Amino acid sequence: MSASIQSDTEEYGLKLGPIKILKGVSPVNILTLFFASFFGIAVMSYMNSGQPLIFGQILGVAENDFGRLAGKLTFYHEIIVIICIAPIGALSDRIGRRPLYMLAFLLIGIGHFLYPLAENEDQLLLFRMVFAVGTASASAMLAAVANDYPVESSRAKMIAATMLFNAVGMVVLTGLFKNLPDIYQNAGYDVATSVKYTRWTVSGCCFVVAAAVIVGLKKGAPSQVTEREPMLSTIMVGLSQARKPRIALSYAAAVVSRGDLAVLSTFFTTWLFLEGRDRGMTATDAMSGGFTFYIIVQAAALVAAPVIGIMLDRMDRVIGLIIAMVLAGAGYLSLAFVGDPLGTEMYFAAVLIGFGEIAANLSSLSLVGKEAPPKGRGAVIGMFSLFGAVGILLVASIGGVLFDEVSRIGPFVLVGIANIIVLVLAVIVLKVDPDPYNA
């Protein structure tokens, strides 16, 4: 049974609409979290979604090698994340989330700044490693802070609120980023220089967020941690908790939900970019067309996030995960039946994918947040993020081969099947470890 049930009568300080916030968390802390959420996913996902222009206009990579190179970069990116993310989560239990969240945005900004300066694939890979350490820290800290601030009865709604800002940021900032190369070209710069200046603009956004985070987030280690245990002991909390069926399920869900995000950011815009190029579009027009559907995915997630958050707080988190896996599996598998990737059918598929993407990530995060022990939550969420990195690694390595050598929709079918597998696991856990508070 669930081992970390908290009472719905838990004391709270602030109340933001239906969201109850723990005592000691200030309005500035909450606003800073939302500000970081607005920028966080957008600046991280642009690394992949904006890559076709780097490959083609900066490095001169042949378009039939885009899938291989994208998969290679994501593969090694996730190796770094796997190495770093559990220690980062454990370290945050000892020194607090704030310095590690600031460092995350600094490294992400440096990665974006260096990326268009690469002269070959090896340099591009090196710069990607810097970025990878930043994303490892950002992913773990966003999840940890979003779980630290609310009372249990508002956990899913709080995570939904951060994902709402994620989605708004994705829609607004991705729309801005996709137009920046054209804006710079209209100002008289060539394509390569425009791509470079676009990346540097994204980099500047990251540095602003880093400054905001160090000033605005709650200081110190989480209040639940009363004494500092050895680092290895803290990391072991994340491993030992996997003996509990619901936490083990959340780790499996992390593999799939983060894989869902990876397949979108790594292959979705690249697929649509290549479809546009096959039809004779210019590189910037093809990139813009791909981003249009990417924005629709995020807009759908934006609409769905509040509804899903409220729904999850009113049901067993495992049942919520089952519903999410149905939506996500249907969304990704539907791409196999889209006749024209740039046509009307794709609008409907993009909306379904958006619903599934946000449901999968929100349900898995709220499940691990509820089941993790208050002391050591950072370590458990760090382990959750590590399993998420494994999912991204699998999507990058297998998906890259499928994309280039089998079919451009291969990676999407792969993650669709993975969602169905987790659906089956969730049904089993629901039977063997029911939640008595939602029975």
Where are these regions (language model features)?
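Juxtamembrane intracellular "pre-TM" segments in multi-pass secondary transporters
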Residues: A3-P27, K219-A252
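Short amphipathic helix-loop junctions that connect adjacent transmembrane helices
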Residues: G50-G67, T266-S288
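Central cavity-lining transmembrane alpha-helices of secondary-active solute carriers
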Residues: G71-G89, I295-V307
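Helix-to-loop junctions at the C-terminal end of transmembrane segments
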Residues: C84-G96, V303-R317, F403
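C-terminal ends and interior cores of transmembrane alpha-helices
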Residues: L106-E119, V326-D340
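Intracellular juxtamembrane helix-capping segments at the cytosolic ends
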Residues: S137-V151, A359-A372
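Glycine-rich segments within core transmembrane alpha-helices of 12-TM secondary carriers
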Residues: I159-D182, S385-V395
